């Protein structure tokens, strides 16, 4: 009888241990870096002021800030396969759902040698969001974000507005 009770107790303890381990959230992180590139366009320059880059994982814990240098990037300097590192960091393992660009106010476009302000209506407040939905591996995860300047710029009566068209290359 004692042997049967001992055996059943061991089975119960094992089952409880397995269920606790299976339900425990992983605290592991994986490395990620974001690169930026652009398609060719006829503008002289398209300068975008990047303040911050954030990612959202599938764990619903909100946005994770990446290491981002506050910088202004001429998108046209990164065409035909050229890229620039704009952010990197460690994020919780899992599936990367979204990337968010947070832009500053120093955005402009140069057309025919003349600099014009580039309006970015929501990008300075809520940021530009890109849906990704990519499972991240334990090794370095590099995502190339293609910011299409030609399709993103809208001109009306001499005013230029940024309506971003950003794709990522899986």
Question: Where are the predicted features?
Answer:
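Bacterial N-terminal signal peptides
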Residues: 9-17
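A short, solvent-exposed, low-complexity linear motif enriched for acidic/polar residues
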Residues: 24-170
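Bacterial N-terminal signal peptides that target proteins for export
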Residues: 1-10
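C-terminal motif of bacterial Sec signal peptides marking the signal peptidase cleavage site
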Residues: 18-22
